[in-house]
UniProtKB/Swiss-Prot annotation:
Residues noted as binding Mg(2+) in the record, renumbered to the chain: R372, R401
Name listed for the protein in its UniProt record: Polyphosphate kinase
Keyword Amino-acid biosynthesis belongs to the record: no
Job description of the protein: Catalyzes the reversible transfer of the terminal phosphate of ATP to form a long-chain polyphosphate (polyP).
Gene: ppk
EC numbers on record: 2.7.4.1
GO CC terms: polyphosphate kinase complex
């Protein structure tokens, strides 16, 4: 018997749970639409990175197998098979929601169903807003098929010259920055691509439009950097980002159009692909013909529309922790260590702490890591302001996938302001979230530390669940300062910390040691691990051994889980759960009954434990330990948003009509009570 679930199929099962939220009839309609948008965006990234990586392995005949022993070719086939039915489910769900929205006055209307007045408005919109932005190409001997960037959305048309009667083909690129949903009347929307299609004869004068289809390509978007050759890492990353859009096509999505037109499109795509693709004749590319609009990720436009608030869940306003009501946050932290649970407790104190430090004349230095900060960052702006007055040292991780460009921008801005900027660490990704502020008062140095499971990004802090920790303890600050020094001197793999634990050297051995300790207590042992993913085979094997010793193990794994639970003789004492709700579960909390409870930036994956700089923080303060344990206990009682994984790899939603509990709703209400 194989002891592990396949990683890729486990991720797809997570995205299925996202799709299930779109099917939840208890949710407002735009909330359901939101989950369809998330589903599609997730799948885009899965193809850009995971499927693209498998294709590279397959095409280069690299004998690399998944944790379950499946070859790249086998995994690609399993992915295609898994999605074949689910893509149809997604289309049906969209059509159901679309019909329900129509009854509520929000209409996504096909162009051919518009009346004459609405078509006139669409024509005006085309002339004033779209005509100058679309890029039409007539494909002939002097105009070959142009390269397509990742996530290109375009129309492919069969056209005929009215005078010569000669037929040819045309490509019309639609820019990504245009509004997809065009509001012609209050609540009535037409799709931009359908408006363009209806006016193709204005782009190709004296031509008849014989056939047309919308299509979208997804390309390999991973960035391969040879760090050994990097003299200027920022410059190398900048050049690599420019190449991201030139990757091989891994997925083609089409809508409408004849089979003959699709064949011609495939032949045209083949004409500019690399030798590898010509050799394989595009057989590795996954092709999906859609009965609905392409790219449901654009549904965010409707979800965020200001006129339809009644069709969404009420916005929750994160609450300020009562201990932070004082004007001087540093005094608050000096009194006691504090733990916040975002988004239920506001992220504002984190921003305020940096802003207060920047304006405080007693502040000597700020040291901080930045992983994903977003395009509009009040935190970076505060650091830029501080850099003109005090010592500011920032490690900006340029390898944060899909945030590389934003991070590079902020790194350059910080450098211009006078901050010391370090662009990551050689062959490691710095994923630890840490901040230490040093002040001088009464002729003494005082250190204030902030550590978190989540990013320094106020926007994601409103939709991700994370814990963040504030302390004025010297032993914690000393460890963080030591870690910063090791990052600056590229000795992160050789240093060890005294109070905290860091990857790649300390976290994995520590977790194994903690599992072994619970094994010594046999049936009295108890482990709860909450993480985003569980993939590391060594950790899984130790959990199997602990189960066989009688240790009870509850795993709350949001996404990928390669461990097989409830297998007799292997893992019958292990239960695996997943919570999918309005907030993305992102905190990592690790509880060991006979030792301690920890929180961490690290998931239980080889990349986190072996190839990243991460932190594992013990909760030595009893109040904080109890708060972390309370989070786990409530989530293990969830009967509305919690799924359980069985030994066959299937997830079933847990339901108890007599005791309904949505853990995320519970924490919202609990935050209100603390005021």
């Amino acid at each position: 018997m194989n002891r592990f679930f396949n990683r890729e199929l486990s991720w797809l099962a997570f995205n299925t749970r996202v799709l299930n939220e779109a099917k939840d009839e208890s949710l407002p309609l735009l909330e359901r639409l939101k989950f369809l948008a998330i589903y599609d965006t997730n799948l885009d990234e899965f193809y850009m990175i995971r499927v693209a990586g498998l294709k590279q392995l397959y095409e280069h005949k690299i004998a690399s197998k998944g944790i379950d022993g499946a070859s790249p070719e086998e995994q690609l086939e399993k992915i295609k098979h898994y999605l074949a039915h689910e893509i149809e489910e997604r289309e049906l769900e969209f059509q159901k929601i679309q019909a329900l929205l129509f009854k509520k006055g929000l209409c996504i209307t096909p162009y051919n169903e518009l009346n004459l007045e609405q078509k006139a408005k669409a024509k005006t919109y085309f002339k004033e807003q779209l005509y100058a932005l679309v890029l039409p190409f007539k494909l002939d001997s002097s105009h070959t098929f142009p390269p397509l960037a990742n996530l290109t959305f375009a129309l492919f048309a069969h056209i005929k010259d009215k005078e010569t009667q000669s037929a040819s083909y045309a490509l019309i690129k639609l820019p990504s920055f245009i509004f997809r949903f065009v509001e012609l009347e209050k609540g009535l929307f037409a799709l931009a691509e359908e408006i363009v299609e209806a006016h193709l004869e204005e782009l190709f004068l004296e031509h008849e439009i014989l056939d047309c289809m919308a299509f979208r390509v997804t390309c390999d978007a991973d960035i391969a950097i040879t760090e050994d050759e990097a003299h200027d890492y920022a410059d190398l990353m900048s050049k690599s980002l420019r190449k991201r859009n030139q990757g091989e096509i891994v997925r083609l999505q089409t809508q409408k159009g004849s089979q003959e037109l699709l064949k011609t499109l495939l032949a045209s795509l083949r004409s500019f692909q690399t030798h590898s693709y010509k050799k394989h004749k595009l057989t590795g590319m996954h092709i999906y013909k859609s009965a609905i609009m392409l790219n449901l990720g654009d549904l965010w436009e409707l979800v965020n529309h200001s006129d339809f608030k009644a069709l969404k869940s009420p916005n929750f306003t994160p609450k300020i922790h009562p201990h932070f009501n004082e004007n001087d946050l540093f005094k608050s932290i000096e009194k006691q260590d504090l733990l916040l649970f975002h988004p239920y407790e506001s992220f504002e104190p984190v921003i305020d702490l940096i802003e207060q430090a920047a304006s405080d004349p007693t502040t000597l230095s700020i040291k901080m890591t930045l992983y994903r900060v977003g395009k509009h960052s009040p935190i970076v702006k505060a650091l830029i302001e501080a850099a003109s007055k005090i010592q500011v040292s920032v490690l900006v991780e340029l390898k944060a996938r899909f945030d590389e460009e934003s991070n590079l921008h902020w790194a350059k801005a910080l450098e211009r302001a006078g901050a010391l900027v370090v662009y990551g660490v050689f062959k490691l990704k710095v994923h630890a979230k840490m901040l230490v502020i040093t002040k001088k008062t009464d002729n003494q140095l005082r250190h204030f530390t902030h550590l978190s499971t989540g990013n320094y990004n106020p926007l994601s802090a409103k939709i991700y669940t994370d814990v963040s920790f504030f302390s004025a303890k010297n032993e914690i600050a000393n460890d963080i300062i030591k870690l910063f020094h090791s990052l600056l001197t590229s000795s992160a793999t050789s240093n060890t910390l005294e109070t905290l634990f860091m990857a790649p050297k300390q976290i994995k051995p520590k977790i194994i040691e903690l599992i072994q300790n619970e094994m010594n207590h046999k049936q009295e042992g108890y482990i709860i691990l909450k993480a985003n993913a569980l993939v590391d085979s060594e950790i899984i094997e130790w959990l199997y051994q602990a189960s066989q010793k009688g240790v009870k193990i509850d795993l709350i794994i949001r996404g990928i889980c390669c461990l097989k639970p409830q297998v007799k003789g292997l893992s019958e004492n292990i239960r695996v759960y997943s919570i999918v709700g309005k907030y993305l579960e992102h905190a990592r909390i690790y509880y060991f009954k006979h030792e301690n409870i920890y929180f961490s930036s690290a998931d239980l994956m080889p990349r986190n434990l072996e190839r990243r700089v991460e932190l594992l923080i013990p909760a030595t303060n009893p109040k904080i330990a109890n708060k972390l344990l309370h989070i786990l206990e409530i989530q293990l009682k969830d009967t509305l948003k919690r799924y359980e994984l069985n030994s066959k790899g299937r997830y079933a939603k847990i339901s108890n009509p007599n005791d309904p509990l949505n853990s995320q709703d519970y924490f919202e209400k609990q935050a209100l009570k603390t005021l």
